Amino acid sequence: MPKEYTSVSKISGPLVLVENIENVKYGEVVEVKLANGEIRQGQVLEAQEGAALVQMFASTQDLSLKGMRIKFLGHVLEINLSPEILGRTFDGLGRPRDGGPEIIPQKRMDINGSPINPYSRAYPQEFIQTGISAIDGMNTIVRGQKIPIFSGAGLPHATLAAQIARQARLLNEEEKFAVVFGAMGITFEEANFFIENFRSTGALERTVLFINLANDPVIERIATPRFALTAAEYLAFDLDMHVLVILSDMTNYAEALREVSASRKEVPGRRGYPGYLYTDLATLYERAGRIKGKKGSITLLPILTMPEDDRTHPIPDLTGYITEGQIFLSRELHRRGIYPPIDVLQSLSRLMRGGIGEGRTRKDHGDLSNQLYAAYSRGLEAKELAVVLGEAALTEEDVQFLEFAEAFEMEFIKQGEYENRSIFETLNLGWKLLRRLPRASLKRIRPEYLDEFWGKEDAS
């Protein structure tokens, strides 16, 4: 039976120092009983011989050293799991926030989990359709991939995240597909937007939400993505489901990590973030993937807002080293009213080749994508030249590529918030746009594909 201690020696901000204790471990859950009988929870941040530093999950402003009783429960944070979590909304610590009952567990799991052993990993493949042309056609996401969305303050990443969560599916309808959504440090309005969006579109029944609000404790923000990923591991590897995990906003998570690090008086690293930021992010991102011999998979889509749109900031910089590409949102496209404002030239899916082609999407997908990239890039070069020298200085072919680039942005990249394009609609739209250009200029596409698809209005 856990012992109770009254040896609290100091309260500093959200931290409580407990002395004269024994057999306490890092990450252990703590129960704090106040003099008035109220019970609060915390977690051991640091354990040394005879002392422990506890981070509270609630405010410490009204705490007093007198009458406090501390009980170390002997286990780390765990989550109750069963198939009933689908369709439910929880707070950042896995407690129901939708008014529903507590989950009766079929299994309890430690939220810290562990990264997948590289030897046990299966190579990510199999196309995931998001219904968004700039992603499906140009930066394809495959099952088991981890690919972040790099955004900026004021850009519609929340709307894009909700759209992906609603529309994402495998082309094989027989596969069981679920979405786990972990929100960190968001406002009440944003939380309500996600919940109502999923409910009104019928996507809630296959979704699990973990929501940490901006006014919730910082330590809870650090736990939220771990609760979300643990739920995803259960759905994927125990129930054989294919799970898409969306984590938003990882910048709020990193800020919380910096705040906790500062409260512990740790030596800061780049821009005040702890030196272990890279390692900490890796413990989250590397939990995504496929495991040999398991039917299920976890695909991870973390969203982060780059402070001051700075892609060299430690958070996007370190994220890029761990993940397998990025989807980049453009402020310039957003300013021109293009949604989703995905900058396809700065975006990249490193595992795209494993998820496209004959038997997965369509045999012309790879060549078509390469040609669209090349044509769009040349069109933007012509646009820059026209700004400097005027359109009169452009050749006839330059003008054609310039018009193609404008049409590509307005017809291919731009689409409605509730517009769900199939991969075949996306590919056919790409061919439709390429017909604006001389056939001889399409040098990235094999002649046999040109012969087969150039004259077809719709192919499947």
Swiss-Prot record:
The gene is atpB. PROSITE patterns: ATPASE_ALPHA_BETA. SUPFAM superfamilies: P-loop containing nucleoside triphosphate hydrolases (SSF52540). Keywords: ATP synthesis, Hydrogen ion transport, Ion transport, Transport. Signal peptide: none annotated. Produces ATP from ADP in the presence of a proton gradient across the membrane. The V-type beta chain is a regulatory subunit. PANTHER family: V-TYPE PROTON ATPASE SUBUNIT B (PTHR43389:SF4). Belongs to the ATPase alpha/beta chains family. It holds the Pfam family ATP-synt_VA_C. This is V-type ATP synthase beta chain. One of its GO terms (biological process) is proton motive force-driven plasma membrane ATP synthesis. GO terms for molecular function: ATP binding; proton-transporting ATP synthase activity, rotational mechanism. Coiled coil: none annotated.
